[in-house]
Design a protein with these regions (language model features):
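Short coil-to-helix segment of the ABC ATPase nucleotide-binding domain corresponding to the Q-loop/switch region
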Residues: 46-53
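Conserved catalytic motifs of ABC-family nucleotide-binding domains
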Residues: 107
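Helix-to-loop junction immediately C-terminal to a conserved catalytic motif
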Residues: 3
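Conserved ABC ATPase signature
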Residues: 86-90, 94
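Conserved ABC ATPase "signature" region
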Residues: 18, 64-82, 129-133
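Catalytic Walker B motif of ABC-type/P-loop ATPase nucleotide-binding domains
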Residues: 111-115
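ABC ATPase NBD coupling module
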Residues: 19-39, 63-67, 83, 173-183
Length: 194
């Protein structure tokens, strides 16, 4: 609903006091809503640097500013050594880093991550957790939807646990982990927050 893929049955969606319920995805992106899908979204026939530049071309920047931002993102995400590699040549980890760098090229206020921990190895999980921490440091709001509870609760300030289509509990990770109903219905009695 936040990015505009589905319409709400009721209620409204607001961003900074602006109603965006009926806005298409591209207008929401222009207002600062970034989205990273669970499925691979890297442009497979473009190089890593062209993937990033493709987004920068839509921003009101001159060429020098675009190149500076692209270089900064390549450096920040450790992509310099593969900058000329095509999207279809990247490992899963490199692809994910490229997708996140590309999403940041739009200069979002919020970024929505759909199942960022799905199907990735433990090193990639740590990598994504580090990246999310960096996003928070940049004052970018991060909304994560994921079934990997341990990985997600480790990096969130606040969480909403959905169970059978409704919010079972909202609160800090510690509050969720300590809640008797949450443990009984979703986490299990032996769940421990790391």
């Amino acid at each position: 609903m936040m990015v505009g893929l589905i319409k709400p049955y009721s209620g409204e969606v607001f961003l900074d006091d602006q109603r965006i319920t009926d806005m298409p995805m591209y207008q929401r992106a222009q207002l600062g809503v970034g989205y990273l899908a669970q499925e691979a979204s890297v442009f497979r026939t473009l190089s890593v640097e062209d993937n990033i530049m493709a987004v920068l071309e839509f921003r009101d920047l001159n060429q020098k500013e675009r190149i500076t931002i692209m270089e900064d993102l390549l450096n920040e995400f450790g992509l310099n050594h593969i900058r000329k590699s095509k999207g279809n040549q990247l490992s899963g980890r490199e692809r994910r880093r490229t997708e996140i760098a590309r999403a940041l090229a739009a200069d979002p206020k919020f970024i929505l991550l759909d199942e960022p921990f799905a199907g990735v190895d433990p090193i990639a999980v740590q990598d994504i957790q580090t990246i999310v921490s960096k996003l928070k440091e940049r004052n970018i709001g991060v909304l994560i939807t994921d079934h990997n509870v341990h990985e997600t609760l480790t990096i969130t300030d606040r969480a909403y646990l959905l169970f059978e289509g409704s919010v079972l509990k909202a609160g800090t990770p510690k509050e969720l982990a300590a809640d008797e109903q949450v443990r009984k219905k979703y986490l299990g009695e032996n769940f421990e927050l790391r």
